[in-house]
Amino acid sequence: MRAVVQRVTKASVSVDGKIVGQIEKGIVVLLGVGKDDNIDDTKYLAEKIVNLRIFDDNDGKMNLSLLDVQGSALIISQFTLYGDCRRGRRPSYSDSANPELAKELYEKFIELVRGYGVHVETGIFAAYMQVEIHNDGPVTLLLDSKKVF
């Protein structure tokens, strides 16, 4: 399972011109599910993300987590995180999970993050979305449950 985590001052996601999710201070999580992922990957990333110390403390050091600052999370599915661009010019998505598994683990990830007491907004799984992100810093991190990077 892969995630792009961005610290934001605000963010929103729209489908067909209508906002379906929006947050103020917090994080945007673009989440991709791989074909070999399971519940353990979901648990690992959820715990890791809510506890990442990427928010500034009073001394201006990144020392506080999403939980510490009581921030929100906007979680959006993004299968293209498994795009393999090593050969040719068109990405291959053969490492992405099938839609059924991807939806199941995406929804479980949302449930787990909410279980930490985080206010969560979401996009719509498999929909064509427009995402507006006001990246704060900018702070952008790449995470992989298999620790590839």
From Swiss-Prot:
The lineage of its organism: Bacteria, Thermotogati, Thermotogota, Thermotogae, Thermotogales. One of its GO terms (biological process) is D-amino acid catabolic process. It is found in: Cytoplasm. Pfam families: Tyr_Deacylase. Gene3D superfamilies: D-tyrosyl-tRNA(Tyr) deacylase. SUPFAM superfamilies: DTD-like. This is D-aminoacyl-tRNA deacylase. Its EC number is 3.1.1.96. The keyword Cytoplasm applies. One of its GO terms (molecular function) is tRNA binding. A motif (Gly-cisPro motif, important for rejection of L-amino acids) lies at residues 137-138. A Gly-cisPro motif from one monomer fits into the active site of the other monomer to allow specific chiral rejection of L-amino acids. It catalyses: glycyl-tRNA(Ala) + H2O = tRNA(Ala) + glycine + H(+); a D-aminoacyl-tRNA + H2O = a tRNA + a D-alpha-amino acid + H(+). It comes from Fervidobacterium nodosum (strain ATCC 35602 / DSM 5306 / Rt17-B1). Belongs to the DTD family. One of its GO terms (cellular component) is cytoplasm. Keywords: Cytoplasm, Hydrolase, RNA-binding, tRNA-binding. Homodimer. An aminoacyl-tRNA editing enzyme that deacylates mischarged D-aminoacyl-tRNAs. Also deacylates mischarged glycyl-tRNA(Ala), protecting cells against glycine mischarging by AlaRS. Acts via tRNA-based rather than protein-based catalysis; rejects L-amino acids rather than detecting D-amino acids in the active site. By recycling D-aminoacyl-tRNA to D-amino acids and free tRNA molecules, this enzyme counteracts the toxicity associated with the formation of D-aminoacyl-tRNA entities in vivo and helps enforce protein L-homochirality.
